[in-house]
Amino acid sequence: MPDIALWSACDHRCVMCSNSFEYASTIRDYSFDSIKKRIDAYKDGNGFSMHRFPDVEWDWTITGGEPTLNPDYFKILSYLREQFPKSKLVQLTHGDNFADDDFSQKIATIENYHICVPLHGFNAETHEAIVRKKWAFQLLMRGILNILKHRKSGQSLEIRLIIQKMNIDYLDKMYYLIHKFFPTVDSISTIMMEFEWQAIDNLKNTHLSYTEVMKKNESVFLKWGEIFGERFRLYHFPLCVVKNKKLWPYMWRTLPAHEITFTKPCMDCKSWKYCMGIHEAYTEFNGNKEFSELEDISHSITPDSKNFRFHPIQSVM
């Protein structure tokens, strides 16, 4: 799965952003010609460094900064679609530009396009405290409505909740907002924050552990998992920290192998092949006391044989 950044700058200042401030100063490297060269190199077999998941060849993940800020954004998407007509384009975006109706209608012409937008709070105060941009919540709400209004067959929308200290107590309200105002969204993904760059710089406001998340939200996850069904997903959670087995079918692998680590208890775990792994920097800030080996669970689960790479557990018996 190639991973390509279209723009390094961003007009949000999220407290847990995985990019450094210095990264935003490399805008000169994101012209259409520069990006075209990278795409062409990949197609010619010289772009292995763009791979996030080397075993998934054709889907493209489009990142930034904020990629929709690139003046040549639609020109780049058109070129990607021309060169890879069967590939899914997975777009990571803060969603602000989708508040513009013309922009959203133009997006609706792109085939096989999956949009991922983050929701950080349940209202303007809680959301904008994290993104640090005034009116961002209003823009996101309008943007989501526009995406749902204009999307065509072959397009889908994923709303992502990135858990960190500043919103860990609001997840129930955030799920309720989605359920009430955006009931037709295709997937709702809850992601454990990665300890990288801005998240580390703002550790006082972002730090949390798996144990804290599950203590406060296990019942919340169970409740909304029942309501959302298969659309509900948990990302970046190791199996052993999620004690309630009813949640296991909602857990997905989304980190590439080079960003995953395992601790000493993992070495003796009889169910490691079903685990999502631990983000590589997590133990540096939380230690490894949360993790424990599991007995063999193969007799009590049904694997997802069609998508085991990303979704190892289909159901629990």
Question: Where are these predicted regions, by residue range?
Answer:
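Short, electropositive alpha-helical surface patch
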Residues: 76-81, 167-185, 242-259
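Conserved C-terminal portion of the radical SAM core fold
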Residues: 5, 50, 55-62, 84, ...
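Structural recognition of alpha->loop->beta junctions
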Residues: 104-120, 176-189, 251-270
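N-terminal pre-triad scaffold of radical SAM enzymes
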Residues: 1-20, 47-62, 68
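Canonical radical SAM enzyme core domain
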Residues: 24-44, 67-112, 118-125, 133-139, ...
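Flexible mid-to-C-terminal extensions adjoining Fe-S/redox cofactors in radical SAM and related proteins
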Residues: 20, 243-317
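A conserved mid-domain beta-alpha-beta active-site/ligand-binding segment of alpha/beta enzyme cores
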Residues: 239
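Canonical Radical SAM [4Fe-4S] cluster-binding loop centered on the CxxxCxxC motif
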Residues: 1-37, 41, 275
